[in-house]
Amino acid sequence: MKIFCIGKNYVLHNEEMDGRKYKTAEPVVFMKPESALLKNGKPFFLPEHLGRVDHEVEVVVRICRLGKNISERFAHRYYDAVTVGIDFTARDLQRRLKDNGHPWEIAKAFDGSAALGEWRTIPCQEPSSDLPKEEGVEALASGESAVKTQEEPSLKKDWDGLRNGLSFHLDINGKTVQTGNTADMLYKVDELISYISRFFTLKTGDMLYTGTPVGVGPVHVDDHLEGYLEGEKLLDFWVR
């Protein structure tokens, strides 16, 4: 299972971090290990040695089939669920690493740095005979199957809402600190899936954190974090 993450995908967030509004020439992609996952409402234990750790609320999608070199027009067939998550970032450490021209994975990919909410399913369409094999569109091969389960509720909004606009926000201690809408993404989900699949084979169960909007800030011990998608609370945990 791979956790893909996108940076610099909301123009106002780019401005708050770099002092100017801009769009990168290509999506900024980085990854987190499976050990970064924090789910089921478990607390986030703040690593003291990392210094300031910021919250970055994001919409997360789940990959539902095998694919490689996927064209954007078929990308919607490759995800079957959506939720909200938090990309925790050791901000002081990240800045030091970037200033020195070093990779900054340790500031983004430490244990517990990928908080994940409850999934809400959306249609994962079956591939049809008109899809070219070179697009990487295959029947779920090698025993792979979609990860959707009967227990998972469906997203109340039609899946097209992910393209046209899903609202999400993060509350800390009852106060809203970040709000966003997928309509404001610089690179949309289908574009991101197509781009990432040029470099990595996507597999069932992989996840894509799609970037954070403006409003990032530090978390502290005893903070209560709640993440919402389309007004529904899908993420709820404490910082310890």
Give each language-model segment a name.
Residues M1-G85, R91-R96:
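Extended, compositionally biased flexible segments
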Residues N9, H13-T24, R91-D130, E151, ...:
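Catalytic-pocket segment enriched in acidic/His residues
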Residues A139-A141, A146-T149:
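Ala/Thr-enriched low-complexity intrinsically disordered regions
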